[in-house]
């Protein structure tokens, strides 16, 4: 009996040892399975980090990185370079080439983009610039900036269908003359009129005087019984827009008229004024604004939205692994990318965006109409 038990014990021990050995081999087999190794993709961000654009340059850089991180699925390495002037841009480009970079996000302006175009082409580097100059676009150079004149046409067409009396409050300069001419051309076709334009110099006294003159004209129009509120088009940089806002509040101009512009008039005003502009409310359906505040960005202007979209779209189009042909096909596709700055696709290398008409009253945003 003891002999039988002894043999049974040996058999059971051998069986358990065999079972455990088979489990160990199975586990080792799982451990030794490796995923296909992917090459790390080198991406360059070329934004100003010194000079007058240093603050916004850092903000755009941080938002591009945020966008990349939010959509990344592959191995990427991001290096930031100074794009503040010609010398730094050229020096950065030498380093970008040396690192075998695949994609450059930036520069911010057309002239700096032109400086690096030929070297990028020679080294098979894709550029997605934040410039809005369509003349730059090529097969591997994409123009991602906003298009102010398209926004102007969009908002004037919309308000031209509902209002007859228009005015413009603009800084002196060639571009303002272009705005005025485009407005006149559109409004004539709609049996409306650009009745008055104030071109002001770059100082507080001139701005206050221009707003007063526009306000007086608005009063005259509002005294008529056959019209609706006049519409006033604004366009300037944030500093002067805040000076305008001070005078607009003084003369109650945002209540006696409808103030409109492109997305650049939505700045962080010291005086709250009611405005309408071309943009999108996609930002408010995300947590990007709160996260941007952690980076020290208290107001998200349209260029901030573009910077975030630039990073996120790039990572999204890279996908699981960077293949240049696939990436370029996605960039050239008419399938829109849904971004914070609108629904985006490219035609001939130039970003096209759908612009809604947004109204801001007492600090509250809402959509008037969708494109």
Curated annotation (Swiss-Prot):
InterPro entries found in the cross-reference section: Peripla_BP_I
CDD domains assigned to the protein according to its UniProt record, in alphabetical order: PBP1_YraM_LppC_lipoprotein-like (cd06339)
Listed name of the protein: Uncharacterized protein RP748
Species of origin: Rickettsia prowazekii (strain Madrid E)
């Amino acid at each position: 009996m003891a002999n039988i038990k002894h043999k049974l014990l040996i058999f059971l021990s051998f069986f358990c040892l065999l079972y455990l050995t088979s489990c160990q081999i199975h586990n080792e087999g799982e451990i030794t399975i490796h995923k296909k190794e992917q090459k790390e993709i080198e991406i360059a961000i070329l934004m100003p980090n010194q000079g007058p654009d240093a603050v916004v340059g850092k903000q755009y850089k941080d938002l591009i990185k945020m966008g990349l991180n939010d959509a990344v699925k592959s191995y990427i390495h991001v290096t930031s370079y100074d794009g503040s002037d010609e010398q730094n841009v050229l020096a950065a480009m030498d380093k970008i080439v040396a690192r075998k970079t695949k994609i450059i996000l930036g520069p911010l302006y057309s002239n700096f983009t032109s400086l690096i175009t030929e070297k990028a082409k020679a080294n098979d580097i894709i550029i997605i610039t934040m410039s809005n100059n369509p003349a730059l676009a090529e097969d591997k150079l994409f123009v991602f900036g906003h298009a102010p004149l398209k926004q102007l046409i969009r908002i004037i067409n919309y308000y031209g269908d509902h209002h007859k009396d228009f005015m413009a409050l603009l800084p002196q300069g060639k571009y303002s003359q272009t705005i005025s001419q485009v407005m006149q051309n559109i409004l004539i076709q709609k049996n409306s009129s650009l009745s008055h334009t104030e071109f002001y110099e770059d100082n507080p006294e001139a701005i206050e005087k221009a707003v007063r003159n526009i306000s007086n004209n608005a009063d005259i129009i509002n005294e008529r019984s056959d019209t609706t509120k006049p519409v006033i088009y604004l366009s300037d940089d944030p500093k002067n827009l805040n000076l305008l806002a001070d005078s607009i509040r003084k003369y109650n101009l945002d209540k006696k008229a409808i103030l409109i512009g492109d997305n650049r008039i939505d700045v962080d005003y010291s005086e709250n004024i009611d405005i309408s502009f071309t943009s999108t409310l996609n930002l408010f359906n995300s947590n990007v604004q709160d996260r941007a505040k952690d980076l020290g960005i208290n107001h998200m202007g349209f260029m901030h939205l573009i910077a975030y979209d630039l990073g996120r779209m790039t990572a999204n189009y890279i996908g699981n692994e960077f293949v240049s042909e696939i990436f370029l096909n996605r960039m050239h596709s008419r399938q829109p990318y849904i971004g914070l700055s609108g629904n985006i696709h490219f035609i001939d290398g130039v970003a096209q965006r759908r612009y809604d008409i947004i109204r801001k009253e007492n600090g509250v945003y809402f959509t008037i109409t969708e494109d």
